Amino acid sequence: MKFKYGAIVFSGLLGVSAILAACGTRGKFDQIDDGKIKLASSLTSKGAANALQAIVKKYNEVKKPGDYPIEITQIAGGYDQARVDLQSRVGVKDKTNFYNLILNYPDVVSVLARNQMELPFDGVDVSKISPNFLNFNERISGVSKKANYAIPVSVSTDILVLNGPVLHYILNSAKGESKGAQKDNKSAEVQRKSTGQKTVTQPLTIATDSATNGLWKKIEDAAKVNGKKKEEKKSTRSKRATEGTQTTKENTGGDAATSDTKIKESWGAYQEVEGGLKGYQFKAIVFENWHDLIDFSTRVAKSFSKVKDNSNKKGNEIQGVLGVDNSPNALLSSVFAAGNSDYNNFFYKVQNGRADFSNFNNKGSSYKNLKNVFNDYKNLIAQNGLYVNKGGSYSSNFQKFHQLAYSISSTSGFAYSFAGQNSKRFKFTDDGTFVEYPSYTTEVNAPESNNGNDGKQQGQSDQGNLLGTFEVVDKSTSDIKVKPKTQAESKKSSDSKQTANTGKGSNSKQQTPKKTISLYKTKIPQDKTENVDAFLVTDSELISKLEKAKNKKEETKASGKSASARVAVQATQKKQSNEKQIVGYTTTSALSEDGKHIFKLGKLNSENYERKIIVGATVETLEQSTTLQSEEAIVLAAPGKYKDSDQKRVMITQGPNLIGVHANTKENEETKKFVNWFLNKTESWEVKGNGKDSQTTKSLTPAQYFAESASYILPLKETVEKDHKEQTNKNTYVAKALEMLKEVSENKSVSYSDPSDFRSGRFRDALGANFNATINSKANFEKFFQGFKAALGSDFDK
C-alpha cells in the first residue's frame, strides 16, 4: 500500500510525543514571533560545532539593522536525538521554544510534512550547488509541493582505507616471502625448523594487470615506510608516577621485511588452509565490489588463528580483517547496487510525495538481494573476521594500531584515523585493554599534601572531601593574555619544564590564563560553584578509584630497570619533586563511559561538551612501526558494486542538511534571508595555516567555511565538476571524495541516499541493530530477518 502521511507511530523511542501525534494533535501551527531565528544543532564534531558558532557570530555582526539575529539551540545526543526532539515539539505544537532551522537528515522533512510544518526554500539561491546533489528532494514523502526543503551543506561519503603494512604482511606471508623465507633453501630450512614455520606449498600469486600492479606497489611502499621509521621504545607513565624513561634508536632495517616482522608480532603466523589464501590469486578488483571484498576478507580470516579462533576479542587484540563503521550504509548500498541502482528494485521508494514499501513487504527483489548480501557476510562473521561499530567505537580506533587490515569509513573522519609521530593510548592496568589517548585531555591531580597554606587548606580542613583538581582555559579572561616570558626567563626555567614542544618557538607565544576545577565527593564548598569551578562526584565506583589513586604513595617503578635507567628516573624525580600526583585524566572528547574505567563527569558552563573522566590507566607512547600513519594508508572508494558484473557504480552521499521549519510569515522570511547569506555571501574567516599553530585569513561563503572546518564537502558546481587528479590536498579522504563526487556529477556513478520518509530512520536503525547483533549470535538469515521485521512494527505492513 502507498502512503502520503503513513502510520501513526513514528518510533517506539518517542514515548509521549508519539502518543500525542496519535491522538489527533497533528496539523500546522504558527510559532510566536520572538524576533530571532533559532538554529537547532546536534553536531558532535568540535570542528563543525565551532565553525557554526563562528558563523552565527559573523551573521549577527554583518546583518542589516532590523534583520533578525540568529542563535544556536543545542540538542545533545546527535542526529537521532535531534529527530526525536523535533518530533516531540511538533507533537505538542510548541509555539514558544521551537526552532526555525535544523541541521539533520532529509527524513526530518517528512516528519515535519506530516504536520504541514516543512518550509520550502522558495527564493533561496541554490544555483551554485550541483543539481545532482539536490535531486534527493524529489524523494521526500509527504511534502505539499515540489521544492528544495533540505540543502546539502556538508556532504561526505564512504571510503575503503587499506592498512598498507598489515596488508603487505598478509599477502607476503601467503606468497611465502615474509621475513624468514630466504632465497637460500638451506638457510630457509634452518629458519623454519628453529621457528616452527611451515613451508608454503601453494603460494598466493599477485595478478599482473596494471591496476593490481599499481596497487601492489603502493602496498609495498607503505610497508617500506613502516620499516624505515624510528622505533621508539614504549614509554609508560603511570597515572601516579610523573616520569618514565624513553629512548630512541634508529631502525637500520629500512625495508618491508622489518615491517612484516613487527606486524607478525600482533597478527601471528600465516596458516595455509583450504578456503583461505592457499593458491589464491590477488587482484585489485576485490576492493571494487562487496562480494569479492567479503570473500577475500573471509579467506584472510581463515588464514590467521588470531582472527578465526577468537570470538570474544579484547580491546588490545586483533579485531578482525574488515571494519565497517556504518553497517546500514554497507547493507543498503549493496542491496541498491544489486538492484541495478534503481529505487524501483529497492526496499522502498518515494514518488510524488508518497512512500511505497511494497517491494519490501512482498519479499520482492530487495529481499532476495538482502539475503545474498547477508549470506556473504555470514561466512566472514563465522570466521570472526568482521568488526562493526556498535556505538561510537570506530574502526579507525583499531586500524591505527594495526588491529584491522582495512575498513569502510566516512570521509569526514580523516582527523581521527591515523596515529601521530608520538601516538599515545590509555592502557588500563587491571585488564590490559586500552583506548586511544583522546584530544582535549588534561590530567586530574591529587589534592596537594599538607605543605604550605594551600596544602593545609585542601588537606586538613576538607577532611577528604576534595578528590582532585584539573585546569581548563579560563574563558572569562580569555582576552587577557599573560605577558610572555623573556628569552632569558624561558631559558632559566626550561630545564625543569621539558615538554614535547620544546624548541618549537613556544617562548614567543602568549600564555592563556587557566582556572582550577575541583572535584568533591560530599559537598561543594560555599566559595565554589557547581559546573563553574567545581563538580560533585556521586558515582561510588569513581569515588573509590579516585581515592585509591590519591592515597597510594608515589612509586618510582625503577626496580627491574637498568642501573642507568634508575639513575635517570631518580634524577628526574628529584628535579620534579614539586610536580603534582596524577590520579586520572579528563576529556571533552566523545568517549563512551563504561562504569569501570571511563565515567561521566558533567558539563562546565563555559564548555560546549560533557566531560568524561578516565581512571586506572597508564599512558603509553607507542613505537611508530606499531601504528598507522597517513602515508601508509591506501585510500580507495568504498565498493561501488555488489558484484563485478553490476552495470553501475554506487556512491553513498550523506551528511547533515540545512532544513527549514515553518514558524510564521516574518520568521520564515528572515530564515530564508539567513540561508541565502549562508550559501552565497563571501566573508573573511580565520582558518588554520600551514604551520602547526598558524592561522590565515580566507574569503569563503559561510557554507564553504563550515564544510572546510568539518572535513566535509560543499557540493558546489565549481567543486564537483573540477578535475582533481593533480590535487595536493593533504586530507587524502577529502581528495578521494572529490574524485568520487566528480564521477557522480558526470553520471559515471549513481548517488545513493535513503528515500526520505518519516519511517526511514527507524528502518535504517532496525536494519543496522539486527545485523550488528549477528556478530555475536551468528544467526542465520531467517532469524536475522525475523528480528528486523519485528523491530519495525506493524505500520510498515500497511
Curated annotation (Swiss-Prot):
Covalent lipid sites (N-palmitoyl cysteine): 23
Entry keyword Signal: yes
InterPro entries the UniProt entry points to: Lipoprotein_10_C, Mycoplasma_lipoprotein_cen_dom, P68-like
Species of the source: Mycoplasma pneumoniae (strain ATCC 29342 / M129 / Subtype 1) (Mycoplasmoides pneumoniae)
Keyword Secreted among UniProt keywords: no
Pfam families, alphabetized: Lipoprotein_10, Lipoprotein_X
Protein's name according to its UniProt entry: Uncharacterized lipoprotein MPN_200
Biased composition range(s): Basic and acidic residues: 178-192, 226-235, 478-495
Family, similarity comment: Belongs to the MG185/MG260 family.
Region of interest: Disordered: 178-204, 226-260, 443-463, 478-515
Coiled coil ranges: none
GO cellular component assignments: plasma membrane
Taxonomic lineage from the root: Bacteria, Bacillati, Mycoplasmatota, Mycoplasmoidales, Mycoplasmoidaceae
